[in-house]
From Swiss-Prot:
Chief site of localization: mitochondrion
CDD domains reported for this sequence: GST_C_Metaxin1_3 (cd03212), GST_N_Metaxin1_like (cd03078)
Pfam families cross-referenced by the UniProt entry: GST_C_6, Tom37
Gene3D superfamilies: 1.20.1050.10
Record text on subunit structure and interactions: Associates with the mitochondrial contact site and cristae organizing system (MICOS) complex (also known as MINOS or MitOS complex).
Protein name in UniProt: Metaxin-1 homolog
Residue ranges crossing the lipid bilayer per the database entry: 282-302
Keyword annotations: Membrane, Mitochondrion, Mitochondrion outer membrane, Protein transport, Transmembrane, Transmembrane helix, Transport
Function description: Involved in transport of proteins into the mitochondrion. Essential for embryonic development.
An individual GO BP term: protein transport
C-alpha cells in the first residue's frame, strides 16, 4: 500500500492538512504503508493529494480519510486504530470529527487559501514552486475557488469566532491527557493533528488563528508530542528546511511591513477632511457668481440700460 502526500516543509513531514491526517493515522497504528512525497495530484482520481494506492488486486485509490481508517483497521497489523474505544466513545469521536469539519476546517482553509496576505506570501509561492508551469496556475486557481465556495456566505469575523470556540473546545477536551481519548492515540488525534500542526508551524503574516492556538499550551504540547513520537524528520530533511528558513523569514517580514504601511496610509487618509468632488466645487462657484450678480443688479451696484433703436 502506498500513501502519496505533498512534500515536507516548515518542520512537518508534509504541509497539507489532509496529508498530515492520513500520515499521522498510518504511523499511529504502525501500518507498513509506503510513503511517497508527490507533486502530481493529477494522478489522484479526485485531483488532490493525499491518495492511497492499494497494490493488492484492482482496488481503486482512496482519498477519503474515513475510508482510509477502515482500511487500516483491516490491514492485520498488531496495533489496530480505535480498537479500544467503546461504542459510545466511537459515536463521540464521529460527532467531534463532524464538529471540527464545520467549525475549524473552514478557518484553516481561510487562513491558507482565501486570506489575501497569507495566500500571496506563503501558499501561492509554495505550491507554485513545487508544481510545474502552467499546471501550477490551474491547480492554485482550482484550490482557491474550492475554498471560496466552502466559505461562501461567511465573513472573516464569523469564521474566526467559530474557530476560536473550536480550539477552546479541543483544549477543554484534551485537558492534561496525552491524547484525546487517554494515553493511546485514535483517529481523532490524527484528525486534530492535521488541523493544528500547519497552523502552529507554518509562518504567516496574518496569524490571528496561530496566536489563539498558541494560547492553548496543552494543544501546542499535543502537536509537539505527536510530531516527536510518530513523525520525526531525518537530519537531511531538517537541513534542507533550515536552508530555506531565511527566505521565508524575509518574505514574512516584508509582508508584515507592507501590511503596516498600508494600514498607516489608510489611517492617515481617513484623518484628512474630505475634499468635495470637482463637480460640486464647480457648481458651487457658478451658483455663488450668479447670486452675487443678481444681488449687485438688485441693489444698483450694477445698472443695466436699455437703448431703443430709432428708426429713420
Amino acid at each position: 500500500m502506498e500513501l502519496h502526500i505533498w512534500p515536507s516543509d516548515f518542520g512537518l513531514p508534509t504541509i497539507d492538512v489532509v496529508s498530515l491526517q492520513f500520515l499521522a493515522c498510518s504511523k499511529m497504528c504502525a501500518s507498513p504503508v509506503r510513503v511517497i512525497q508527490s507533486t502530481r495530484p493529477w494522478r489522484s482520481p479526485s485531483g488532490e493529494l493525499p491518495m492511497v494506492a492499494q497494490t493488492e488486486g484492482e482496488a481503486k485509490p482512496v482519498t477519503d480519510f474515513e475510508k482510509f481508517v477502515d482500511i487500516l483497521k483491516k490491514c492485520g497489523q498488531d496495533v489496530v486504530i480505535d480498537a479500544d474505544l467503546t461504542t459510545i466513545e466511537k459515536a463521540q469521536l464521529d460527532a467531534f470529527s463532524c464538529y471540527l469539519h464545520h467549525n475549524l476546517y473552514p478557518a484553516v482553509m481561510h487562513t491558507f487559501w482565501t486570506d489575501e496576505l497569507n495566500y500571496n506570501t506563503v501558499t501561492q509561492y509554495w505550491y507554485a514552486s513545487h508544481l510545474h508551469f502552467p499546471y501550477n496556475l490551474y491547480y492554485l486557481e482550482k484550490r482557491r475557488k474550492k475554498a471560496l465556495r466552502l466559505l461562501a456566505g461567511k465573513n472573516d469575523t464569523e469564521i474566526l469566532k467559530e474557530a476560536f470556540m473550536a480550539l477552546n473546545t479541543l483544549s477543554t477536551k484534551l485537558g492534561d491527557n496525552k491524547f484525546f481519548c487517554g494515553n493511546k492515540p485514535t483517529s481523532l488525534d490524527a484528525l486534530v493533528f492535521g488541523y493544528l500542526a500547519p497552523l502552529l508551524r507554518v509562518p504567516l503574516p496574518n496569524d490571528r488563528l496561530q496566536v489563539q492556538l498558541s494560547a492553548c499550551p496543552n494543544l501546542v504540547r499535543f502537536v509537539e508530542t505527536v510530531s516527536s513520537i510518530y513523525l520525526p524528520l531525518g537530519e537531511d530533511e531538517l537541513k534542507r528546511q533550515q536552508a530555506n528558513r531565511k527566505m521565508w523569514q524575509s518574505r514574512i517580514s516584508k509582508a508584515k511591513a507592507d501590511k503596516e504601511a498600508a494600514k498607516t496610509t489608510e489611517e492617515a487618509s481617513e484623518s484628512l477632511p474630505e475634499e468635495p468632488p470637482m463637480r460640486d466645487a464647480i457648481l458651487f462657484t457658478l451658483g455663488a457668481l450668479t447670486l452675487s450678480l443678481v444681488f449687485a443688479i438688485h441693489t444698483g451696484l450694477i445698472q443695466v440700460s436699455v437703448e431703443e433703436e430709432i428708426s429713420e
